[in-house]
Amino acid sequence: MTEITAPKSAVTAEQFADEIREQLKYTQGVTVEQAKPADVYVAASAAVRRHLVDSWMKTQADMVNGNTKAVGYLSAEFLMGKQLENALLNAGLTDQFDKAVEALGFDAQEVIDAEYEPGLGNGGLGRLAACFIDSLASLGVPAFGYGIQYKYGIFKQEFDENGKQIETPDYWLANEEPWGHIDYNRDQKVSFGGEVVEENGKKVWKPAWSVRAVPVDYMVPGYASGRVNTLRLWTAKSYDEFDLLTFNKSEYLDAVKPQVEAENISKILYPEDSTPQGKALRLEQQYFFVSASIHDAIRVFYPGQDKPDLTTFPDKINFQLNDTHPVIGIPELMRVLMDEYGYDWDTAWTITNKTFNYTCHTLLPEALEVWPSKLIGELLPRHLEIIEKINDQFEAELKAKGVAEEIIKDMAIYTGDSVRMAYLATYGGSHVNGVAELHSQLLKDVTLKNFSDVYPDKFTNVTNGVTPRRFIKLANPRLSDLITEGLGTDKWLSDLELLKGLIPLADDDEFVKKFAAVKQANKVDFSNFAKRKYGFDIDPNTMINTMVKRLHEYKRQALKILSVIADYADIKSGKVSADDIMPRTIVFAAKAAPGYYLAKQTIQLINNVARVINNDPDVKGKLNVYFPWNYNIELAMNLIPATDLDEQISQAGKEASGTGNMKFALNGALTVGTLDGANVEIRERVGAENFFLFGMTEPEVSALYAKGYDTKGLSREYYEKDPQLKAAIDMVADGTFSDGDKDTYKDLVNDWLNKDYFMTLADFRAYMDIQAQIEETYRDPMKWSRMAVLNVANSGYFSSDRSIEDYLERIWHTGPLK
């Protein structure tokens, strides 16, 4: 008999239907007969919030009144996905919702689909933050997520008639948004500019302007924990929204100028920073949300106290810096402690150092933020002074430890011209963690080697994870039911290591066939979704081969599309008959940063390869490429369960971790990948025989760099000696995918042949060889499905619950509320 332990609310379906009906009447102002699915979505969301409020308030009260240290997760991104279905699951209301909505005459999925996905993140960083706050609540750990409520998100991606990416505003707040509760009574004042003066022997910052940070609270219900934490996102408002005198002079635009300037801070995620104004806006954003969050935490944990004892602040809350975006919080807390509460430098430093911890998410030098000191001085003059003093203290400490002058110079936080935020975070906090074992080792050996040599105890690893509630239970209900059937319990949703119980079932033909049937049904569902949403005609009887992630050269979408072009070239030249090709559908999805030229060129190329190949009768439908636009959580939740083969082909030593690889493995996709990021740990756990490995290792990559690969044009040698590679690049260069225009992709081709920094060409042959092995394996359906079962069974380690437990043990030293 199957044991079901999922949360189940005491409310009945009839009661829930009455609550929805009541919300429609009193909140929406419509009857059930007048209502549309969007109205029912808003009403149902309001009803769910009512069921969460008591637990939310109790969680906050227990957090403030108890002795359990809280976590403040500071992140520029929270890629939450749709809220209603997740809240229903975690609150135990899914069945009641389905029956109630049906009784009211609506389709439950249509109501779920009426929700517009929040535009609060870009990629893995934001999705990780969302998984983590879900796990914190599910484990009963008191926590705040702190960030910004971006009015227009990152951007909405569209493609023009030439396949180019077009960025348009993401109007995710244009319709009624029932989950965020704005609280004007708990606003914070955030100031910028001005000067620092000395008054009575003390430094006093006299800002030039201020904005109002208003919190918008989102409930974060835990799964089966009875706890509801808070995601607090700040929106920027002006203190002088409207100048009536100016307006009455018919100077209408000037009358609202202060409002526009203030609200720009929370307009979009990652504004283009190629201009001085864009750089300034990014820094304003970062300071805006960390300043508001620090002041908010003091208000929360020391309510009504004018002179709180902030020496206990690190015992109340630990701030986790999710990448470098919130690092300006270190000098901000120093400023608050010294200038607002009168603490001396040493006491303030001790408090600050104990309060902050830093997660580094990259190995790419350009992603380790460096701010011009001139800009910091203009926007945050007091903070620049504090940073200079931190650097002086740091250098003195290094000298006392006997560190060589040359190394001290290399480790400088403040160089005179710039401020290195990763270095400030490393010195200013208690711990630094990487996000996969290989990444953490490379941080210690390469990226932050000098810091690791001097402060070895600061460094640790916490491998990333994903929440199984959203990415298995919600995304893949068929697989979820099969897992529960196979294990005889649903406890795996809160203890994912229980998936190991599926290992013996990989030898059970009946179970493996059921598993394959689940995958095929998911492929049919995705085919229908893609037709409905994008107009694509995807054949669910082909292999679904997926590469979805942010578009960046190091992730090497170029390698994947070159392999597709090479296969196409073989068909066109007659070397291979389309009749002999294993049918394959390649799905790309990715956004490129608006100013990232080569990434946008790659998107254009993929779209045009798709246009040409998909319409060429010589291919006979055996090779198809699709690029659904505007990749988001909804698309991921439809595509991941349908995927047979997942591409994780970044250059070794460049990907910090990745979480897409975990989601795919947990949903029964096999992985082709390099020894990079969390691929290393996935392969170790699922077994080398169940992972398609190719490509150079990180030491081999380093050795090739040492030979001058990217500076001496060595990539051209690979092009010249590999006929398949040459044919593929020549097709791009000769205009095959640009209506005969040889200039369209000349910059991309030039980069491949003369630089190729991320060694796409160097790994091409190994990649083509592994693809041949993949095809051979896929032609044996039972073997493939057994391998897929073992991937699921051995991927339980990659739960975000386990990640949070590691943070609790290694970094935060706290636990669930009592």
What are these regions (language model features)?
Residues 1-818:
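A conserved ligand/cofactor-binding region detector
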